[in-house]
Amino acid sequence: KSPDFKPICLKSTVTVSMRNTFDRQQSPNVIGYIPGSGNTDESVIYLGHWDHLGYGAPINGDSTINGATDNAVAIAWMLEMARCFNALKEKPRRNIVFLSPTCEETGFLGTKYYVEHPLFPIDKIAAVINLDVFPLWGENNDVTITGYGNSELDDTLAELAKKYNRYIMPDPDAYNGMFYRSDHFPFVQKGIPAM
């Protein structure tokens, strides 16, 4: 921390030997859908991962890392969306898919698997809407979008926000690159509009 600090090269080497074992584990993605009433080849995916970090260093004796905002709220959101879509008298034209992938916290492995083994044609996905880390600050009128400006869906969102008296809040931490670090990104890499 001193402004006078200057690194020096020690010209030394270190040899490390390590023995490691691992167990192969399986963890499922969870998916449900409501069939579309029209072009049932096309789908809209609502996405929210179900995993969290699990356990870590204890805080006040509790080592459980609770995942209420990341990402249990997204699961509640998807269940409510499914209930609302199912209650509609006139069903949407497209299939409405609810995908809750596993292992987002370890590199969105569940989503990567899904885009390589889709249950609905990957080239017929019209949009992917991802909810990750939902703030629980009470009612507000803003819609904060991670990576706003990077999605083909931005204009559609802007129209809807205006229609419902909401305003769009661009990603306040865009420098963190969160657009590239959540479950919608494997879909983006396949050319699918996602946010």
Describe the residue ranges of each PLM region.
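C-terminal soluble interaction/assembly domains
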Residues: 77, 81-82, 86-91, 108, ...
